[in-house]
Amino acid sequence: MAVEFRSMARRLTGAVMITCMMGAPLAQAQTAPTLDPLVIAEFGTPPDIPTGALSDSVQAAVKTTFIDSVTGGRWGRDQSVGLIEIAESGDPRLVWLISDLMRFASSPQLHNALSAAASELLGKPFQTGNNWGDVTDHLLAWDVPAPPDYLTAKRAIFTEIIQGWDRIFVEGDIDWRLVSWGGVLIDDRPFDTTDEPCNCIPAADNPEVTSAEEATWLDDDDVVFGVEVNGEYRAYPRQIMEVREMVNDTLGGRDLGIPYCTLCGAAQAYFTDDVPAGVERPILRTSGLLSRSNKVMYDLNTYSVFDTFLGHAVTGPLAEKGVKLKQATVITSEWGAWKAAHPETTVLKERYALGRDPDFRNGRDANGPIFPVGDVDPRLSVHEDVIGIVTGTGTPVAFQRSAAVAALTRGEDVTFEDVRLELDAAGVKAVGPNGADIGSHQAFWFAWSQFHPGTALWPQQ
């Protein structure tokens, strides 16, 4: 593998031979991660992982290879030499930086050189055609630690290549290993100017709505995400949400931020008016980043990053204030059933779909997740729909949607601890002991189980 890697480096630089002297490595303990046998069966045995600081020469190679290459806008002989030193360091932690640069590498030669370096360090060939995804899946599944001072180099890569992320890549309660580029730019347009075009996933602020009778453009079998607040109902058509992915709205006298992660199959509704004193209403936007295939949202006012799936701020001023957004229930239904159950509903106007109807679920995602997710809890298939909720005791539980609908249709009770499921407009919601809304939503199994590892599952598998 080392010969193959050096050969690639020579082709990149045009040199006949590249040699480099490695500095003496620091004394480092070698540890092999302890993993579930199912992970090893799928991904193989992980390499030994060193601990401790990088040697001076490897630190210099990291700077040359990953920082200077993007700040200088070129890949030359020095970078190829640095990549060889990194590949020969025996430190798989450095593959996280290789993965980060691979995500942006448009040159097949550079991509192949980075892939060869990853193969050298991980002890596995990567020849899938999506080597970045395959490499990253292994890093995730094996839970390979990040190298020392990881954020500094990662920040340089991401902020030099994509403008607008300088205030995003900061220290916080976030595992930066999991964050990758989603292929789009940040949506940083000012609040209530979301009709302006952008090279981003365009949020919709204060969207115009119509009555159900006026929404003749919707077919009865079109999927909608239904929300009720203080007796007011609104439908957010999936074909709009697949284009917008974020809505800042007001319903029932409450301010809401509604992200939809197409990759996770999860539409969620967060109350953005219930925040600590002195905190301005968060205006939620799409960053263009992903965390293990879940969209990364942030607050436009403070650039505080949120864990989109869990609703708490993980960086910035809002994280310092401990902001965690409460959820309203989102019911995944069909337009015909929703308007029949709630004829007074309003619905977003057709123009917010921007003339598109991508139907990602039956197209792009038909063969599984398109971004790295690592190992997935094997109790259900990755794209199985579940209804997720955290009980009063703090226990996360996922209800298999198909099984729950069948049981409820037969008149059976579907319960777990203090949570009970109910049918609503051919969709499913979870309620508490007194029938109160407790903020449930639908998602793909792989997403729910990754953000709630060890989650309870109904019915038990």
Please report, for each region that a protein language model flagged, where it lies by residue.
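Bacterial N-terminal signal peptides that target proteins for export
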Residues: 2-13
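Exposed boundary/loop context
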Residues: 7, 16-17, 296
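Bacterial N-terminal signal peptides
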Residues: 13-24
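Boundary at the C-terminal end of the N-terminal hydrophobic targeting segment
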Residues: 27-31
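Mid-to-C-terminal functional-domain signal that highlights helix-capping/loop sites
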Residues: 32-52, 56-81, 92-461
